């Protein structure tokens, strides 16, 4: 009898051990989920943790900064909505995927450059896109982009209040404030609509804080007693002395292409610059931060928080009076640099700081690597996994290539240009025969106020950067023809 009990007890212990081992193995091999929160036009330093705006409160964004990795030198390949979003999705440069300006006709060549979400679908993921897409203005089911099982979006910039939306091909008018609507849809999909047996990938891509920067009514009086602090490095004192003439013309108030006389140096503008609109942008961030907090809470309630890679970024930077500018597009730091925070406790230690230069085309390969999916050959970015682990990747890039194509809708914003940026230097070439280029020493002049392009002491550095530009253009197959894909699209439309 005693031996029988021992046998039974041994069997119970055996099966218990096997069961626990299987559970542990399952937890180790369980694929991570992905939550990608993308804000529109958020300056890299418009966050509470930066201290740039002492009154700014972003507790949930700050929590993400504490809990994961802050990629302090994260840049977009082109600083404008549509091109940057397409690059995030495809891992390719705008001159490759074809969306190199905000144009109502153009999508990426999806058949050649599938979004990372399509590869996740093939790997067993359930995927959703909630929010702005801002590519070709398509309607009905044509508006649904490849790679998503659930779709909730809108055409172009959309609207802040009571927006017209597209849900899985059905168009209707929603009621409320856009940030809240998108948050509710994302949470509804997480809790009620997805297959709980599958790993998921959710894009929550906000319209805010894009101009006209309309905050939620509950935040309209936020910070009303506060003053905008002057920018670091006194960049608001810009006079454009020694800088390209096209920038002085742009600032002076007429089309930079017009052959009109312009002073060699402009008077300093009084601070604050664009006070009302910039304060409203900061107010818009409150609803964004609340949204992030709500989704994080839902993930925690679902037991999926620590198994979800949370990514927070912006499609481009934004000028808040630096160099007297508003908007983005140009090759200044405030335009091309964006916040990038990533949390994944299984891999990333708390308070990780990454100094290396990373690009928006690096995100898609990184997501695929974490999901156990091989990077397709067309993706030009690199997995950031080694950096996220806290390692020192000796083979990581030493320079980046930035590009801008003159926008057909906003031609006065600036000419087509490229920039090469290293840890210390930046060269900007606007391809203008009758104007000068730009060269900045980012170590000694982080505000990019002193153009060194005509300084003989920097001739060797200038040539090195031009050689680097040539190398990068070959590496990334740079195509200066802005309209190559647009012409194909419009030609095909004429045939219909």
Residue ranges and their predicted role:
Residues 24-29, 41-55, 154-177, 189-198, ...:
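Active-site-proximal cap/lid insertion segments
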Residues 58-61, 86, 113, 117, ...:
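Extracytoplasmic/secreted envelope proteins and their assembly/folding machinery
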